[in-house]
């Protein structure tokens, strides 16, 4: 029993995170120097994401009997994303108004260092609905894969899958080649995941070493509020959705515990994307549903980021004594319904979207971003974890609604997790 525990990725990542925290706390300088380990692991994961998505989506769509089923899956997914993301935004808005973590800080926006957030504000200027939609269309296929833009690769994969499906028997050779190629990529993922403990150690040691546990004290109230809100959202909202669909949210969380620990160490839900594709398929979801819902969810279904955006925006208003009546907050909510769709599941994207939102709303000081710049890194873990669980639940919900879920397999995997395929 013990050897299997020590060999499990779950234990190794958990131990690596703990060691990283200790190193960063007791030797901050050395801990901060561990950053390349975390960055290197995330880059290795990103290296494989584009081809994995392409192969999964193409083989899933091309292998379906009806193209109408693909369109229905996409429509159901987008409706679900919009409804649940809106609920997340509203919950964040309600909690921050009730607890008021920024009240009493009395910060003068003129005293804040606007230069510290200038980079984010500049990137935020490029955010917009039209710009976002145009960015989904790649300048070239090679460019989409080279940049690792998930939505661009997804668009090309969908078109490729449709075209391959229309070829009928003539496309069998190409279909078999791509399907076989996907197994090679998942084999590469298995090799990369052996380095997950190293990546988690480096990222956590850097975070604690650079920012220190002490930096959490002053603005700790916002962090605590945010973590509690994310926890409540997962347990109550996603838990209720899971119950309606027919599974237990806690058993599902236990099923993806290794992916959650990887995300905890890297602060990016994108780092677990390749494994989630395989695990959701192993859970009983058809490949076509998994290939569409999860990659799309990384831009349209970021529940943790949605909660963060409303809480952070109102927190800045409270801290700087910027008045926000009910109409201002409704305006904020409407703006976030659009701007939040431009956030990808990578570290720091939520902060850029927040800068874009403050600029769009107008009456909130963009310089107020400096207040949470130092603690944003500590909130990214909760964002990423909530995003990952949210996308997993979304996949099961959509698969259930479109009749592409093997419920018997779902129950078997969640109840008897020991039967989980080891190749994932």
From Swiss-Prot:
NCBIfam families: PRK01663.1 (NF002461), PRK13027.1 (NF009587)
Membrane topology qualifier: Multi-pass membrane protein
Example GO biological process: L-aspartate transmembrane transport
Domain of life: Bacteria
Localization (cell): Cell inner membrane
Gene3D superfamilies recorded: Sodium:dicarboxylate symporter (1.10.3860.10)
Organism: Erwinia tasmaniensis (strain DSM 17950 / CFBP 7177 / CIP 109463 / NCPPB 4357 / Et1/99)
Residue intervals passing through the bilayer: 4-24, 44-64, 76-96, 142-162, 184-206, 222-242, 326-346, 352-372
HAMAP family linked: C4_dicarb_transport
Positions of disulphide bridges: none
Keywords: Cell inner membrane, Cell membrane, Membrane, Symport, Transmembrane, Transmembrane helix, Transport
GO annotation, cellular component aspect: plasma membrane
Name this protein carries in UniProt: C4-dicarboxylate transport protein
């Amino acid at each position: 029993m013990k050897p299997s525990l020590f060999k499990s990725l779950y234990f190794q990542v958990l131990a690596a995170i703990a060691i990283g925290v200790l190193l960063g706390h007791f030797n901050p300088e050395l801990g901060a120097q561990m950053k390349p380990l975390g960055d290197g692991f995330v880059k290795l994961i990103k290296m494989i994401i584009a081809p994995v998505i392409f192969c999964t989506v193409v083989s899933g769509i091309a292998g379906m009997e009806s193209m109408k089923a693909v369109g229905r899956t996409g429509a159901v997914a987008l409706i679900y994303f919009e409804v649940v993301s809106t609920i997340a935004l509203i919950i964040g808005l309600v909690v921050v108004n009730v607890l008021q973590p920024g009240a009493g800080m009395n910060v003068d926006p003129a005293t804040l260092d606007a230069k510290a957030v200038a980079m984010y504000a500049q990137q935020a200027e490029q955010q917009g609905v039209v710009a976002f939609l145009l960015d989904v269309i790649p300048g070239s296929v090679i460019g989409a894969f080279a940049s690792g833009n998930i939505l661009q690769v997804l668009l090309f994969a969908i078109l490729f899958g449709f075209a391959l499906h229309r070829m009928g028997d003539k496309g069998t050779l190409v279909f078999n080649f791509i399907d076989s190629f996907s197994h090679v990529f998942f084999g590469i993922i298995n090799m990369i995941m052996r380095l997950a403990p190293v990546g988690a150690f480096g990222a956590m040691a850097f975070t604690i070493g650079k920012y220190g546990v002490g930096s959490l004290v002053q603005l700790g109230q916002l962090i605590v509020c945010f973590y509690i809100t994310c926890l409540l959202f997962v347990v109550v909202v996603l838990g209720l959705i899971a119950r309606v669909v027919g599974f237990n949210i806690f058993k599902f969380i236990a099923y993806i515990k290794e992916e959650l620990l990887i995300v905890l160490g890297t602060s990016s839900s994108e780092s677990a994307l390749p494994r989630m594709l395989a695990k959701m398929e192993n859970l009983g979801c058809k490949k076509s549903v998994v290939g569409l819902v999860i990659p799309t969810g990384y831009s349209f279904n970021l529940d943790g980021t949605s909660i963060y955006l409303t809480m952070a925006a109102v927190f800045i208003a409270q801290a700087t004594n910027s008045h926000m009546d009910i109409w201002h907050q409704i305006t904020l909510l409407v703006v976030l319904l659009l701007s939040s769709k431009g956030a990808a599941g990578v570290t720091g994207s939520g902060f850029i979207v927040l800068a874009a939102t403050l600029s769009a709303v107008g009456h909130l000081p963009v310089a107020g971003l400096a207040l949470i710049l130092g603690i944003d890194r500590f909130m990214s873990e909760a964002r990423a974890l909530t995003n990952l669980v949210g996308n997993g639940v979304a996949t099961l919900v959509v698969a259930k609604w479109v009749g592409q879920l093997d419920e018997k397999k779902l129950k078997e995997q969640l109840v008897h997790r020991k039967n989980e395929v080891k190749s994932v």
